Amino acid sequence: MGNQLAGIAPSQILSVESYFSDIHDFEYDKSLGSTRFFKVARAKHREGLVVVKVFAIQDPTLPLTSYKQELEELKIRLHSAQNCLPFQKAAEKASEKAAMLFRQYVRDNLYDRISTRPFLNNIEKRWIAFQILTAVDQAHKSGVRHGDIKTENVMVTSWNWVLLTDFASFKPTYLPEDNPADFNYFFDTSRRRTCYIAPERFVDGGMFATELEYMRDPSTPLVDLNSNQRTRGELKRAMDIFSAGCVIAELFTEGVPLFDLSQLLAYRNGHFFPEQVLNKIEDRSIRELVTQMIQREPGQRLEADDYLKQQRGNAFPEVFYTFLQPYMAQFAKETFLSADERILVIRKDLGNIIHNLCGHDLPEKAEGESKASGLVVLVSVITSCLQTLKSCDSKLAALELILHLAPRLSVEILLDRITPYLLHFSNNSVPRVRAEALRTLTKVLALVQEVPRNDVNIYPEYILPGIAHLAQDDATIVRLAYAENIALLAETALRFLELVQLKTLNMENEPDSEEVDEATRPNGDYDTELQALHEMVQQKVVTLLSDPENIVKQTLMENGITRLCVFFGRQKANDVLLSHMITFLNDKNDWHLRGAFFDSIVGVAAYVGWQSSSILKPLLQQGLSDAEEFVIVKALNALTCMCQLGLLQKPHVYEFASDIAPFLCHPNLWIRYGAVGFITVVAHQISTADVYCKLMPYLDPYITQPVIQIERKLVLLSVLKEPVSRSIFDYALRSKDIASLFRHLHMRQKKRNGSLLDCPPPEDPAIAQLLKKLLSQGMTEEEEDKLLALKDFMMKSNRAKANAVDQSHLHDSSQKGVIDLAALGITGRQVDLVKTKQEPDEKRARKHVKQDSNVNEEWKSMFGSLEPPNIPQALPKTSDHEVVPTGKSPRSESSAGVCVPLSTSPQVSEAAHIPSKKPVIPVVSSTVLPSTYQIRITTCKTELQQLIQQKREQCNAERIAKQMMENAEWESKPPPPGWRPKGLLVAHLHEHKSAVNRIRVSDEHLLFATCSNDGTVKIWNSQKMEGKTTTTRSILTYSRIGGRVKTLTFCQGSHYLAIASDNGAVQLLGIEASKLPKSPKIHPLQSRILDQKEDGCVVDMHHFNSGAQSVLAYATVNGSLVGWDLRSSSNAWTLKHDLKSGLITSFAVDIHQCWLCIGTSSGAMACWDMRFQLPISSHCHPSRARIRRLSMHPLYQSWVIAAVQGNNEVSMWDMETGDRRLTLWASSAPPLSELQPSPHSVHGIYCSPADGNPILLTAGSDMKIRFWDLVSPERSYVVAGSTGSPSVSYYKKIIEGTEVVQEIQNKQKVGPSDDTPRRGPESLPVGHHDIITDIATFQTTQGFIVTASRDGIVKVWK
């Protein structure tokens, strides 16, 4: 711009804000600094923040136009240079006070980034240096020289992408060596005196004599030296190479510049060399690169491209060239403006990224480490997006990426770059994100195996306080995550403390280090730090152990309670953990929590030691009598483990053995196995004498024969007696007066033993009935003995269940989200998982009579009674107490908690019997077996035939429904043949106070309904529209939905009306129309409120009945397509439309309900398969004009009729091929042209097959009603319109393969033909005066048209 500017003193100094008065697109934000040459400000634009550089014009003769053209050309040349950011706009103010340059704002330049935390590591510096050379190479190959490369003009984004900006071709190429004024004016904008200019640009001052003469004598005319300069020499590539070398050197010396102005001038003359600064560059290849780039002779400097090739694999890793540069360049494009998109792209490419950056097939380890370090560049992209992510899925994807990359990152990156963002996410508004952030933080910190000096206090001062609030988070899922990870967090914090302590001791013991830096020394000594850490963790552990949600407590116990014991030490493990855990057994409603206690108590007891056995003994005994059999199993397993570890004293062991021995006949298989496991472990721990003297007496009642190797599980299991029958056990356990039952059973046992002469029947009728029921279920004397052996357990369990019931009544048992199946009387269905042995038919036949008592009522109902209905009297009768089943019930081997419910179908047998080895009573005579067996089969066959008949009826119903669907009519009352409305106004209805949005007619044409922006829905009687009454009013008005009612529809075959409002409400109304013409009633039946942020309001709705479902389909503005099953009040299906193709404006459903089509605001028409809920195809209008209304074609199943924005266009599209088959064009514009001189559009469509001759009625913004005869287009006409409308004719032509019916205005008024009916008198303005919003027809004694308009008017025509 000439060197003369340096000497001009401004006549007036204005603030930079004052120059924004004439700029309308930019709003001043803040000043970025000012110099004599430029005033720099940041401004707001609709596309983002921009930098505005203002040049105050002091000399109006300056040739600014040429500079503006040069900058425009430079912008075009650098369009494809991804590392260059030229000025996007150059403007001169109208008042000619200033010239302004505009470019995108980038927050950080390289000078600021070098001194900003987190500091750049070596690989990031190499990456930035690589990009600087790449940017210079891109500019030079585009024919552009920069002229002012310095750290202030190298912009660095938050993801370390370099942008070379502020191209200074307008600044002077050459500067006088003896006068620093020009340098200060043009290049030293930072006032640091740092010089990046190539030495050859400083020339002898004689060539600037003209300027000096002017400064001495102001009367001398000023000469613009710029043109002369350009003829003498322009900017050379070598000049930019020198400047780039200075920038790279400053990057690798932590901000120490190579030259200031005086040093550069001395270097130019050979009196100075920056060796001292260059030696600070540790990397030899980088030092050699810089040395070559700052050669004093320009000819010795290479091109930027040559340096890139030369340093490939040396200063710059190979992966920069092969992967990082092309991959990262895609994020610099405008298509990736969203942080969410960047994260999703990286997650999609993660496998490829890991393969390229962390491949394990490298020949040398050093190269592998170099490639792995390239992940740091990728991490900067991820972290730059974290704070601006919008969707929950994107945030979770980012956390997933961090977790995948963390094991391959260095400690510094994990602590300095990753951890702060994870703590930021721990304060996110979405609970899922907070929970996942905590999990990710825990796993990332667990990877740190060494602690840097500056991070010695990161846990107590940063991490633990940063997540402390999560222990009291409102969301249970977050507290769950805290409970799940607090043990690992505490373990990692302790390891950090120990690593810091070890490092401190090593530093103190080194002879060369007399003093330890106070900044890196941990606060206080080790014991003090450990005590503080214990207190911080203890506070959160106690909070979690006292959480109101049991699942949080359970999670804490199941995830590292033993590690917390190690962290706290023995004393605190006993005082803090064990004392809180004991209280969990008081919760009688949550057996999962009690079970988790016994799962985790072994680890705690093992750490606390055998001293805890006296405390745990009553707790373990309580677990052995728990009401839930799962808890008993867990208590048995805990006792077994504690016995193996020697944590139980010998007297306690024998006491537990006495309590556990009766479990050997418990009906639950898992409990029996648990009891066997404990007995065998005890046998291992004690001597042989103790086994036979103390242990065997407990076992004798439950084994069939003496056993020697009692410590072997298989041996003990093989000699166990048969367990108590599950049905008998459960029935006895559920009895209210179980104590009286056991007293009577004890008396019966004494009588059998001979110690009691007689056992009178029980006096209590309830006990007598109970005993009779037990005997009828097969209770034998042996079963009675086993029940008595389990007496203590059953009494305690009965009391525990009673207490649990009482406690559930005291507390609110109907907890939110908890369904009590027992309270609902629902019985779980079970099958035995033990495979039964196949037996010969005659054996199975013999057992049928005896097994009937064990089969439940449902089995009998399904397959018939096992006992024939008419048993011959010759069969011997046996008493109840003699009848013992030969097979075992499935519940004899499993409890309700253990068995897996395989099916809820009644066909699944609940009595998969396992035959007994020894029958207890003789079988019946073989003479009656064949008939008994035959009768059972006949009963089963009858049930099977009934099932087959039921299935046949169901199949017939489905076939009829299918036929109904195939024979579905387009409309129940079509217009009469040859119907051509005359356009006579029958009724003018003005009850609505705002725009009417939709009209719908009921199936039998008895009613029609309108909805309006005034919030009302009005029901009209069609019979009163024939003009026979003097006044016509609506028969019903409904206004309780709120908001503006946008759409409505009648349900097929009913007087149910569905309506939707813009406040998100959708309601189903019932209309009692059986009393017409009397006033009917209306009442809401169902309703739902849509999420305005997630779904938005409803834009269109339809109803169809598929036989099995009555579906109300509605589309929302945010792209949701929902099928609401009105019979089950749930969604039959939900589809999600991609909003990239536009917002949904309308949709239509195929008459056979096989597919639907949606229209969008961008002209797209997308088809969905209703059977599989999958998108089929999508076609777009050539002009991408908005689809205003969609309708199915009445004759062609694959066609849709679409009303398009502009030119009154209505087109018929074959969605199977995507072809536009027929277009109705009521516009003066050339048919099918994309220009729209006519803004009018069709807003309402009515189509009818009309007995094979389809007709179409349209109405819209031109306030005309048109009748289109699709068979004979020339017979189409305007039914009703504004007064004085010119007459029109219709012609059919073929344009580009599409049939077009065009409306053409007649030049002269032609009388109506015989076929065209006359409209009403021309003088009566009967037409609408505002946009017609919808049109419909109904049939009474004749055909009628009903229209509605934006001014709230409803008109009826015939």
Curated annotation (Swiss-Prot):
Q: Which Gene3D superfamilies match?
A: Leucine-rich Repeat Variant (1.25.10.10), Transferase(Phosphotransferase) domain 1 (1.10.510.10), YVTN repeat-like/Quinoprotein amine dehydrogenase (2.130.10.10)
Tell me what gene encodes this: Pik3r4
Write out the annotated subcellular location: Late endosome; Cytoplasmic vesicle, Autophagosome; Membrane
Query: Where is the catalytic site?
Result: 148
Organism from which the protein derives: Rattus norvegicus (Rat)
Q: Which residue intervals make up region (Disordered)?
A: 875-899, 1307-1326
Q: Pfam families of this UniProt entry?
A: Pkinase, VPS15-like_hel, WD40
PTM: Myristoylated.
The name under which this protein is listed is: Phosphoinositide 3-kinase regulatory subunit 4
